[in-house]
């Protein structure tokens, strides 16, 4: 028997058959899916994802020299064959068969790139795609002999149907919980099913890439034992907080400073106590200066201790500057930089374009992930494969979303839908953290966020906010708005009165104009500095230090 090849190593010394690759992806999909109680669904995706390579034309392509491969890249399609096989075999039974076959066949067809099943003109792209499959009889014959016969597919399929039924019941209960009108139910059901489709695709893409990287570059993915890591991180966190306390007590403090320090510790204690609650969607409303980052981290670590199945802790913020400010705090607090991934557009890494770094940097395998709201939303909604593959990492995790009020209004509905899905179907524990909570549960929304009870992690919010009132806002009333040059001149006059002045503007151009004008009009002894995202991350950090 001649086994068809899936990959040949770059040094041309090692070969991986389609059967070997399928088995590797099957095992990875099973492990990832098992954590979500969908191991069989994920394994079916793995079994069929590459059977389209079981044909001579693809085997010849894999064995061809590099120039021939480059000329044929993208022209020998293989992913639709598995989709066609599943669709024709299983899209004939009851409604659950139809739904399951559609989920698996789309994941298989889209694992090298997503596509719309229906275009704007109403044509069904999916049907057209599988009708164009070539060499299907050869694929069926070879794959049944080399791959499919090795698996008890009927048993796996029956178990997959049971898994999908359980998922469907979770989604139905979520829709009923939202008390939607009849006109809303179908839309919500379709949205949540699409979320689940993306989840299955995420597991398949990530497993496919992982097994391929393991063979091609002999890269082993880093395995973190979350329970062990979080236990060590919790001990390190306690030592870190004790260090902060000792450092604080060394210096003579004012009554106000002592009071604020005491209140921060009280808030942190409330967060730790709240960790005994079950997985849900909660609000952490802490006044500015109340220590949101450390309080949120203390809660997450305590939750991981109370709920041993917790896999990751995510810290998400809207701005790179906030991430840069807080990621160092988190690294120091947990005591090991290797546990913490910082993922945003300004992160600078050596050999960033190397495949190994692409694999390790962006797969979100680390126990602690600090990323931006943009990257978070990309993971949930982008059509990019590297974004889709991360989605399943959010399952069984604590997700802290800081400054959630900064979310664009146009994102609210889809955000609410997806948070409800992550919590209910993916067992994610979500904390919306800010000093000014938006009304995401507004009852007039078509899809309000479904907060758990009790909703607020901190009690006596009104009292806490009064305790942190440290700023007095004095409006400078003018009939007309300042021009930038006028604003600079007003700041220049204020320099004689105040030792330090902070100016916050809403555009980089405005910052540049005011900065340049101030340098022209103030005395040389006055130090003028500016910070914008036009500066690279390292430059900003040096300025702040």
Describe the residue ranges of each PLM region.
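Inter-Walker segment of RecA-like/P-loop motor cores
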Residues: 336-381
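Walker A/P-loop
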Residues: 278-300
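SF2 helicase catalytic motif II
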Residues: 376, 387-425, 430
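Conserved helicase motor
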Residues: 7-10, 341-353, 506-509, 528-542
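Conserved Walker A/P-loop ATP-binding site and its immediately adjacent core
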Residues: 310-334, 347, 439, 508
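Interdomain hinge/linker at the junction between the two RecA-like core domains of SF2 helicases
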Residues: 436-494
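Accessory nucleic-acid engagement/destabilization modules that flank
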Residues: 2-12, 18-239
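Conserved strand-helix element at the start of the C-terminal RecA-like helicase core
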Residues: 312-323, 494-519
């Amino acid at each position: 028997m001649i086994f068809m090849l899936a990959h040949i190593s770059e040094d041309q010394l090692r070969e991986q058959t389609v059967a070997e690759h399928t088995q590797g992806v099957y095992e990875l999909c099973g492990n990832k899916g098992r954590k979500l109680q969908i191991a069989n669904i994920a394994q079916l995706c793995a079994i069929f994802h590459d059977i389209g390579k079981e044909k001579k034309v693809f085997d010849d392509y894999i064995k061809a020299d590099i120039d021939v491969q480059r000329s044929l890249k993208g022209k020998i399609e293989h992913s639709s064959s598995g989709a066609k096989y599943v669709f024709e075999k299983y899209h004939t039974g009851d409604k659950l068969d139809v739904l399951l076959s559609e989920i698996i066949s789309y994941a298989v067809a889209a694992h090298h790139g997503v596509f719309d099943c229906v275009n704007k003109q109403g044509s069904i792209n999916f049907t057209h795609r599988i009708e164009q499959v070539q060499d299907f009889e050869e694929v069926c014959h070879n794959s049944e002999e080399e791959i499919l016969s090795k698996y008890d597919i009927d048993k796996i399929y029956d178990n997959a149907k049971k898994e999908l039924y359980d998922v469907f019941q979770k989604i139905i209960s979520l829709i009923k919980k939202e008390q939607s009108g009849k006109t809303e139910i179908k839309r919500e059901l379709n949205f949540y099913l699409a979320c689940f489709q993306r989840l299955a695709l995420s597991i398949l893409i990530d497993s496919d890439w992982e097994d391929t990287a393991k063979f091609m570059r002999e890269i082993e993915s880093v395995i973190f034992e979350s329970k062990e890591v979080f236990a060590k991180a919790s001990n390190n966190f306690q030592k870190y907080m004790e260090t902060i306390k000792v450092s604080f007590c060394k210096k003579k403090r004012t009554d106000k400073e002592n009071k604020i320090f005491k209140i921060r510790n009280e808030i942190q204690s409330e967060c730790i106590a709240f960790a005994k609650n079950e997985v849900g969607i909660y609000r952490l409303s802490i006044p500015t200066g109340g220590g949101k980052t450390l309080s949120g981290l203390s809660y997450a670590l305590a939750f991981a201790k109370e709920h041993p199945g917790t896999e990751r802790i995510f810290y998400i913020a809207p701005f790179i500057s906030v991430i840069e400010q807080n990621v160092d705090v988190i690294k120091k607090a947990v005591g090991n930089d290797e546990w913490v991934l910082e993922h945003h557009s300004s992160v600078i890494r050596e050999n960033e374009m190397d495949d190994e770094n692409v694999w390790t940097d962006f797969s979100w395998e680390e126990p602690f992930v600090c990323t931006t709201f943009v990257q978070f939303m990309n993971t949930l909604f982008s059509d990019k494969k590297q974004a889709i593959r991360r989605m399943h990492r959010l399952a069984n995790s604590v997700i802290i979303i800081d400054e959630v009020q900064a979310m664009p209004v146009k994102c609210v509905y889809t955000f609410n839908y997806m948070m409800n899905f992550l919590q209910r179907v993916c067992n994610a524990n979500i904390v919306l953290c800010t000093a000014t909570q938006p009304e995401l549960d507004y009852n007039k929304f078509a899809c309000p966020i479904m907060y758990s009870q009790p909703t607020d992690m901190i009690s006596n919010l009104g009292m806490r906010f009064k305790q942190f009132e440290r700023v007095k806002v004095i409006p400078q009333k003018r009939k007309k708005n300042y021009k930038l040059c006028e604003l600079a001149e007003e700041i220049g006059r204020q320099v004689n009165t105040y030792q330090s002045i902070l100016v916050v503007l809403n555009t980089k151009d405005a910052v540049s104009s005011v900065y340049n004008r101030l340098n022209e009009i103030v005395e040389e002894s006055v130090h003028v500095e500016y910070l914008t995202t036009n500066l690279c991350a390292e430059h900003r950090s040096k300025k702040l230090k």
